[in-house]
């Protein structure tokens, strides 16, 4: 008999600027994870021996993020030695994939309770430092039609007719919503402040929000991907997308996701496991999906992934109350919203990665914490969480409050 996978809680760290002068540079990735594991245990007086596994997404699992950080963090946090650990990478989908895997484990009856989430310290373990043939081997570059993601985003904007002012307006709204959400206390429930080993505060709120951002200031920024386009990457796109004559380069640092540090975890379990632990479920995971998409444009995967999840759940886009569509670049959520004909009023209502940053392996789990809190605050029922994924993939998860 298939079990229902419930979400009992979801918490995250604030996002710190992913540079050496960022507030979380002093905090190692295992420290960020340790803080959340300890917080989860203390919040619920959780008997950690009831947890079967810790599954963490991490896009760059080398250096300080290597050696199966999930298992080592569980030991470091003082959890029961019976708690196993798994680190996985599905590029930017890793944090949400961890939650989906945890749900599958619970639904199958293989495990009863799992902590799932992700971590990425981009200031200490730089993006791409794990290498990989996809972008380092010229033969594989050609075979996989490798193009920098920003050019993929610019291609989406070109195909959809999103202008520079359109994507800048979206970015401006991301900052406005994030600033308003923090000012209104919407993040207070799920964000766990990060202190150092001596208990000194390092960061208690997302560090990269710029409340005064506007279309006029963003207009002064130069597009980031004109030069790589001239190096031959635009030609790769134009060979595959013959309906356009040129790529309109509209994305820049101000309307793209920021490089940040952070971690997030969710507690997922069966009804019986929750009852045994004295926990009350907040939501259930209704359906999840992953799918491959065209690899050159790379960032259109959310649409087919969401459609796949909706079809399997017997639902329609109109059944979803709130959407979290990762803001890798402004054109990505704009494209998905356009494909499903949904209002941006219900998309990323408290800001997103353009304003608060994209800590790669942690982002999917962070989106889960955000939308779960907001469903409860608005007394709504259903949410879709989705991300575009490197290599041309999409991931989607549908949750429902209980």
Label every model-predicted segment:
Residues 13, 17-20, 103-160, 227-230:
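Glycine-rich loop/linker segments at domain edges
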Residues 15-42, 60-63, 86-100, 112, ...:
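Active-site pocket-shaping loop/turn-to-helix segments
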Residues 88-119, 157-187, 265-272, 337-338, ...:
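Active-site-proximal alpha-helical scaffold in enzymes
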Residues 1-18:
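N-terminal amphipathic/basic leader segments beginning at the initiator methionine
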Residues 11-14, 25-31, 35, 43-45, ...:
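N-terminal extracellular/periplasmic Venus flytrap/periplasmic-binding protein-like
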């Amino acid at each position: 008999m298939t079990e229902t996978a419930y979400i009992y809680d979801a918490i995250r760290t604030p996002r710190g600027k992913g540079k050496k002068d960022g507030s979380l540079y002093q905090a190692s990735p295992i420290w960020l994870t340790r803080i959340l594991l300890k917080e989860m245990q203390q919040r619920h007086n959780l008997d950690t021996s009831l947890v079967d596994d810790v599954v963490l997404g991490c896009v760059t699992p080398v250096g300080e993020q290597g050696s199966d950080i999930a298992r080592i963090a569980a030991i470091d946090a003082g959890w029961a030695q019976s708690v196993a650990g798994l680190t996985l990478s599905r590029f930017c989908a890793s944090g949400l994939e961890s939650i989906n895997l945890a749900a599958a484990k619970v639904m199958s009856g293989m495990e009863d309770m799992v902590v799932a989430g992700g971590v990425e310290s981009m200031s200490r373990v730089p993006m791409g430092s794990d290498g990989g043939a996809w972008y380092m081997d010229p033969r594989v570059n050609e075979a996989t039609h490798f193009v920098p993601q920003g050019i993929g985003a610019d291609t989406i904007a070109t195909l959809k007719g999103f202008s520079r002012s359109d994507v800048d307006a979206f970015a401006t709204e991301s900052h406005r919503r994030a600033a308003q959400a923090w000012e209104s206390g919407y993040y207070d429930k799920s964000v766990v402040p990060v202190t150092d080993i001596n208990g000194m505060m390092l960061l208690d709120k997302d560090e990269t929000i710029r409340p005064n951002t506007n279309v006029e200031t963003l207009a002064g920024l130069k597009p980031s991907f004109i030069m790589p386009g001239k190096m031959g990457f635009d030609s790769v796109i134009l060979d595959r997308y013959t309906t356009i004559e040129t790529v309109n380069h509209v994305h820049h640092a101000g309307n793209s996701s920021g490089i940040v540090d952070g971690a997030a975890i969710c507690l997922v379990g069966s009804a019986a496991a929750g009852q045994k632990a004295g926990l009350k479920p907040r939501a259930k995971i209704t359906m999840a999906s992953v799918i491959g998409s065209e690899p050159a444009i790379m960032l259109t995967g959310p649409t087919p992934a969401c459609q796949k999840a909706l079809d399997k759940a017997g639902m329609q886009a109109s059944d979803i109350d709130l959407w979290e569509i990762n803001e890798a670049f402004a054109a990505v959520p704009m494209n998905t919203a356009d494909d499903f004909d949904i209002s941006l009023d219900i998309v990323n209502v408290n800001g997103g990665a353009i304003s608060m940053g994209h800590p790669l392996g942690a982002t999917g789990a962070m989106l889960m914490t955000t939308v779960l809190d907001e469903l409860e605050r608005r007394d709504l029922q259903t949410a879709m969480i989705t991300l575009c994924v490197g290599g041309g993939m999409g991931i989607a998860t549908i949750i429902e409050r209980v």
